[in-house]
């Protein structure tokens, strides 16, 4: 017996959504025999329960509830995980050896940390965790209220918060509000660094300290020079930022641009070319958002792997090149104490064993680490002169804190696999651990990549719907539909 004999074809024809008709075969299951949630079931929306928020495309109040509840889940994780890290924190060990990823971010903001990146007070982290937990409860209540009790749609009762996905002016107004909020977020970091206790600067003399960034770089040639730089080699695009003045100055510019752009989008209507160029539907906006998040994730992945200014090595562990250079430096210090002439000793290839010259003539560390000759790190920069490493400083001016830090970084390279088999292959003293730098890099690459796939998927569906053709497989003439049911 064909399925449409049962009358389901009529329901299919009556199912209209913003995008296109969906065909389905009705299945009664024990848990939903008597349950029908208007506006959120397959008959009225064309989407099954596993399509998630797609069921809420045309019920703005319920979609608000889903988003607020989702925010509550995220904030709850943040608070709970912060308290978990505080409970497991061991002051005698570096943060990066304890698998912590939230306390390092809070320490970078200058809370609870002193000279050399030493954590002396975990109470601020406890406060942050509790504040997030309380906030998550408020968000959770709001999510439940709007999902279960509040109005299905906001347009009638709260026109300011209501919307139609096809209303181009309203959509750009919402975009503008989001940009203003992002700009305010950027300025919060600026305010923290300028006026509220300062931030941790790994480049502060003597091995890093909390300080006020009182003179941020505002020169647009410097700030936008990062954006226009090549992403390859030693140029490093925006990832190459190596001082707090430029980093905070960049946030000043981003804050100004986001707020100005937000006000622009709130006050104006999209131009004719923009109305023609973009697809104006809920799924299209989802695809745009996923594309933007993908760029952010992939950028963050590169940033945390290579950059030791925004992500200080005291908290996140050394970068790969930093651990390699630290190994060469550690053995230079050891053998120099034993009487080796580090300036003239040759390695097995005839190149300098401890020191050598780069192709451009600068003095660099010799051996395998020569490929990382352009590394910049706070513990090695004081030993440089006008032409690379200064031989006089190498012989007479190496400080104990530099030796200690290099030895620590040498044995904590961010090369561990997920089962904690880690370290530099040539360093028998390496510690088996997964570096937070490795973890954050790989997780953000993974998330960025799959967000990009999601962007392509939803962009393709949105464009197909806008072009007016059916998506998916036409199942009308599928043989199985004419076969006898299994039961």
From Swiss-Prot:
Q: Which residues bind [CaMn4O5] cluster?
A: 381
Q: What is this protein called?
A: Photosystem II CP43 reaction center protein
Q: Which organism is it from?
A: Porphyra purpurea (Red seaweed)
Indicate how the chain sits in the lipid bilayer. Answer: Multi-pass membrane protein
User: Which stretches are transmembrane?
Assistant: 83-107, 148-169, 192-214, 269-289, 305-326, 461-485
Family per record: Belongs to the PsbB/PsbC family. PsbC subfamily.
**What's this chain's function?**
One of the components of the core complex of photosystem II (PSII). It binds chlorophyll and helps catalyze the primary light-induced photochemical processes of PSII. PSII is a light-driven water:plastoquinone oxidoreductase, using light energy to abstract electrons from H(2)O, generating O(2) and a proton gradient subsequently used for ATP formation.
Tell me where on the tree of life, at the top rank, the source sits: Eukaryota
